[in-house]
Amino acid sequence: MAYTNENQQLMQKLSGEISKVIKGKGEAVQLILTALLAQGHVLIEDVPGVGKTTLAMALGKATGLSFRRAQFTPDVMASDITGFTMFNREENRFEYRSGLVMTNILLADEINRTSPKTQSALLEAMEEKRVTVDGVVHQLPEPFIVIATQNSQGYVGTCLLYTSDAADE
């Protein structure tokens, strides 16, 4: 991929900031920064304790973009990700309460520990750059990037990632 001079400078600056926090992951840092510039998403798979979460958090801090972390456990629900509507008695109307995806960078930590329904909600937001809650469409902020981590298969509590039909086409 060819970078403009401006993008090269930005990548060098961000790489320098991230390398203050995490060492020995130069290639991973470059790949994540490339995904950031391309407004793509990243899936990092490795064994526990090697710095996956630290790397994603360092990127969030270095960019200054809005950042949220979601720890994907079996009890996380799709509405935690997308948001939900709630009745406001004082105003006598329903209001949208934003979910974790309403951020620029979402760290989806250990996504293979949550249910396929919750994974599906995240995948839809990643692909569509929007969520639909109770028939109302809510656009995600620009840029919207997901850095997802997963532990290698075989670790206790992990399950296969949901694969959509679109991925098979």
Positions of the model-derived regions?
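Pre-Walker A (pre-P-loop) alpha-helix and adjacent loop at the N terminus of AAA/AAA+ ATPase modules
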Residues: 8-41
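Walker A/P-loop
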Residues: 38-72
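AAA+/P-loop NTPase substrate/partner-engagement loops
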Residues: 66-86
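Short glycine-rich substrate-engagement loop in P-loop NTPases that contacts/grips substrate
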Residues: 79-100
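AAA+/SF3 P-loop NTPase mechanochemical coupling elements
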Residues: 95-104, 133-150
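Conserved AAA+/SF3 P-loop NTPase catalytic/coupling segment centered on the Walker-B
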Residues: 103-126, 158-160
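Conserved catalytic/switch belt of AAA+ P-loop NTPases
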Residues: 120-139
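Conserved small/polar residues in nucleotide/adenosyl-binding loops
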Residues: 162-169
